[in-house]
Regions:
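Membrane-cytosol interface segments
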Residues: 1-102, 346-367
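Charged substrate- and nucleic-acid-binding regions of tRNA-handling and nucleotidyl-transfer enzymes
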Residues: 28-35, 40-44, 50-55, 308-313, ...
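Acidic/His-rich, divalent-metal-binding segments that scaffold phosphate/diphosphate chemistry
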Residues: 61-195, 202, 206-209
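Hydrophobic alpha-helical segments characteristic of transmembrane helices
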Residues: 95-99, 248, 252, 257, ...
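Conserved phosphate/pyrophosphate-binding and hydrolysis machinery centered on Walker-type P-loop NTPases
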Residues: 127-137, 160, 234-237, 241, ...
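Histidine/acidic-rich helix-loop-helix segments that form or flank divalent-metal centers
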Residues: 165, 205-246, 260-261, 272-278, ...
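Active-site-proximal alpha-helical segments within enzyme catalytic domains
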Residues: 194-197, 240-256, 263-272
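Glycine-rich, small/acidic residue-mixed loop/short-helix segments
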Residues: 316-367
Length: 367
């Protein structure tokens, strides 16, 4: 039996469970029809890990309305952003912090398994604007989860990676929010100062009672030293989790704009990451690009007929994503977004365009 992890808003208080619920060892915890009595029991299930049979879930979701799936995904990520902003900007006491991290990590794990394309769209096309530094680490945690699974890491290591991604900038979130709108890049002194935030973050996490050595190591070393050291040498010191976080962090920085520079198109960012990172010999860059693709959901693309479109889902083939045209070849917005078949010559994807150039109305994305 293949198990899929549940997230908080899939379990209703006072409502019968629609499936049997298992623990991570595959042992039955609650039978279908059991009524979760209160919020404490619901949250306790999530913290301990609540799972359902993959096959049963598949039968249930085959008939789900796509609109409902996408609405659920949008709601899920709004909840993640709200929780993450409260938890990361003001961590507070140790026990609530660790409990909150488990809940947020569970939400992200659930989204990777159940709503992968919809979540990529929400994160890359409709990122939160109030706290860009928090949005960045949420995006990093989601991508790191995807890539860690592709790399074949065990579940415990995947979860540690997600927690490390969420907290890799814990010591510098407020500063990074301010830097996001600054009109010039960091100077040498500022870069040296920022380079310490990994070690500072580790100290903060230790003060919050985090004892996971892999998590702490990844946060402390997710930025490689600027000493010309090779990936192999740095990987030996920092560990695989830190190396993965660095590559995810770098990719997201490339596809995000700043006040002093434009964003790169995702295909350009992917190629830069691949070639400058050592090509196929770099397992982290290779796995990231294979997972995200050249035209990920949320990316803006130009079609052969001159239209601009937004990618809704990855296709069976990397160059054939599902897209929705929003702007005509004349530069005018279309009256209504229109689905295009990228397998047809007129609607072939010829290039990606930088993030933020094209916006898809929310109602169009949900239908």
């Amino acid at each position: 039996m293949k198990l899929l992890r549940l997230c908080l808003d899939q379990i209703g208080v006072g409502r019968p469970l629609p499936w049997n619920v298992y623990n991570d060892a595959g042992q039955l915890v609650l039978r279908q029809g059991h009524i979760v009595r209160d919020e404490a029991q619901r949250e306790g299930l999530i913290l301990r890990g609540a799972y359902i049979d993959h096959q049963v879930h598949g039968e249930a979701t085959d008939t789900q309305d796509l609109h409902a799936v996408r609405e659920h995904s949008a709601s899920l990520w709004q909840d993640v952003r709200t929780r993450a902003e409260a938890l990361l900007l003001e961590p507070g006491e140790a026990e609530p912090f660790r409990r909150g991290m488990k809940v947020i990590g569970g939400h992200i794990e659930f989204a990777v398994v159940h709503h992968l394309d919809e979540s990529l769209f929400e994160l890359l096309h409709r990122e939160g604007r109030n706290t860009p530094a928090v949005s960045h680490v949420i995006q990093a945690a989601f991508l790191a989860n995807m890539v860690a699974i592709r790399l074949g890491w065990p579940n415990a290591m995947v979860r540690s990676t997600v927690h490390a991604a969420l907290t890799m900038n814990l010591a510098s979130l407020q500063r990074q929010n301010a830097l996001h709108e600054r009109a010039r890049p960091l100077d040498v002194a500022e870069r040296a100062d920022m380079a310490e935030h990994g070690a500072q973050g580790r100290l903060l996490l230790e003060m919050l009672g985090v004892e996971d050595r892999d998590w702490l190591q990844a946060v402390a070393h997710h930025h490689p030293p600027e000493d010309g050291r090779s990936l192999t040498a740095w990987r030996h010191t920092a560990g695989d989790m830190a190396c993965l976080l660095h590559h995810v962090d770098l990719y997201l920085a490339k596809v995000s704009s700043r006040a002093y520079r434009a964003a790169l198109a995702p295909d350009v960012a992917a190629r830069q990451l691949f070639h400058r990172g050592g090509g196929a010999a770099n397992p982290f860059a290779s796995a990231l690009i294979k997972e995200v693709g050249l035209f990920p959901p949320g990316a803006s693309v130009r079609l052969a007929n001159g239209e601009l479109a937004v990618v809704l889902r990855r296709g069976e083939l990397a160059h054939l994503p599902e897209v929705c045209a929003v702007q005509g070849a004349d530069g005018m917005a279309l009256p209504q977004p229109v689905r295009r078949r990228t397998s047809e010559p007129a609607y072939k994807v010829v290039a990606a365009v930088p993030r933020g150039v094209v916006t898809l109305p929310a109602e169009a994305a949900l239908h």
